[in-house]
């Protein structure tokens, strides 16, 4: 936390530290501020923690900006140390589910849930919050670099009706939020880095593709079947290429088993794009009637190289799993949009700390995943608590005051 150089007052810094630390230590199913403060010895009233989010004069950007600079500097230092110059930038959004009865929290609304929807005819909507994340990977090191909360345009208009002009929110599309985060990244990335930006078909807009190419970055992403390559839609190309041989590409699945995919390669320009791209048509077997389409702007790469790079998007899904399941991202109980942003900022500070410990763990600790880091952090807290309690009991020659100090008693 000290390495972030947060520009907060001492009370603000203490509340951020308490909440972030308790988020990691807590094993509660729902990590509310009250439950987190019950873990802290001689903690102030939980309302102080809530007030630090609701009315304390700091913003989410006061945490986001230091995390961006810290993670960027750490990766640049590692690049010079390991002589690793290929940076993979993953972009994705995630939906944090809230109870259906949650109505009066400004950041909570119904969003289209593409993981539960069954095509356009059977859409599914989930009540919750949506955030967009940018993740960086350089060699064996990786960080959640930046994030943004997303609100639908209708929700922004509704909230602005009750706000003073200087407090009104501005609606931004998901692709616009993504472009803003990538623009900030461009200022931190050294010129010698070779950058690949990875995202799914939801972000494969022409504006985002053009933006990445203007920075000199390459893009590897999924495409929807209705995009036009040359004079045909992508959905028409499999039939047109039915006499062309498949290339067999082997990929390692999450369970480390090798799986073979049948791939055909195309080159051309998409509608309203001036640069040539490579498009892969992939299917798991000959009988599959719904192939997947992938785009790559680096024409020097083969299909066997492109698809493993696209697989590097998977860890961002793991990040989203940890912030939601283990760090309580969707467990906030604050009403205003700004307070919710602060909660998200504290959660991502906790995630950055865990990722830093994972990246810098000594070899003898055998730390291989964020779960190992969380387990180690909880063990260190438990050991410190036990040692302190034993030392105080020995000093006082009485265990009753020690129990009164270290055990929580509900009133």
Predicted regions, residues:
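Short amphipathic alpha-helical "interface-anchor" segments enriched in bulky aromatics
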Residues: 95, 243, 302-334
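Long, charge-rich low-complexity segments
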Residues: 64-76, 85-88, 190, 386-411
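Gly/serine-rich nucleotide phosphate-binding loop at the start of the catalytic core
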Residues: 1-59
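Electropositive, glycine- and tryptophan-enriched low-complexity nucleic-acid-binding patches
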Residues: 47-51, 56, 114-192, 273-293
